[in-house]
Amino acid sequence: MSIRFVDLEKRFGDNVVLDGFSLEVPDGDITTIIGPSGSGKSTCLKTVIGLIRPDAGEVWVDERRVDTLEGDPLYEVRRTVGFVFQFAALFDSMTIFDNVAMGLRRTGELDEAAIGERVRESLDLVDLEGVEDKMPSQLSGGMRKRAGVARAVALRPQYLLYDEPTTGLDPVTVTVIDRLILRMRDELGVTSLVITHDLESAYRVSDRLAMLHQGRIRWVGAPEAIRDVDDPAVQGFIRGEPELWEEAS
Ligand SMILES: Nc1ncnc2c1ncn2[C@@H]1O[C@H](COP(=O)(O)OP(=O)(O)O)[C@@H](O)[C@H]1O
Ligand SMILES: [Mg+2]
């Protein structure tokens, strides 16, 4: 049971974004893909739930190949994969309760009482009690982010995908979100795939780091190991030296 990317290729026009991208996300762990803005991180994350289709290669969730799925089978896979969007992506005209309840209502499996219970449980998990009736605009950026996590876990997914969970937040809120990512692993047992260019946050939450460079994974390993990796691309990224990064091939 895991998420696997096998030899993905993706281009937008002349822009080759993924070029032989392969990675396995082991069960129960937090795997983080790091790389600069524009390197293709969101693109690979979106292939997992069918928001972007690769030009070639395969994406697997457990035993299901998802890159070619459509309709109900794709929807079934999406239920097992919670997605925390970069800017929380809450619906502004809906209360926090309705935002978190949306996916649950769509399945039609729970009655309103059970949905209410699940929404409150999910908000408790992210330390957001008592905001059910508020609108997204009434919450701080960090609270909106947490509400986005609550919505992603409401269906009790097996996997959680986080797109830049800490980008644009103040340092204290970054720590809150980092702890939340760890808590989702520890309390819900979810397998997590995080993408970020925030290295400090990546060091804190990851069981495994994977560095994306020129459309493919350049290096995978334990966070403690990355500083000693003898590769100009890796060193260029972690030390913020664009010349090393760009010249590495
Ligand atoms: N839907 C799209 N249409 C055209 N170009 C896109 C689209 N999505 C992403 N791109 C381009 O693909 C590259 C990688 O984007 P993205 O995956 O969002 O990078 P990252 O998340 O690492 O910042 C960028 O050059 C971006 O402009
Ligand atoms: Mg992105």
Model-derived features: positions:
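Helix-to-loop junction immediately C-terminal to a conserved catalytic motif
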Residues: 49
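Conserved ABC ATPase "signature" region
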Residues: 64-65, 112-130
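ABC ATPase NBD coupling module
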Residues: 66-82, 106, 112-113, 226-229
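Conserved ABC ATPase signature
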Residues: 135-139, 143
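A short, proline-enriched helix->beta-strand linker immediately N-terminal to the Walker B motif
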Residues: 154-158
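Catalytic Walker B motif of ABC-type/P-loop ATPase nucleotide-binding domains
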Residues: 160-163
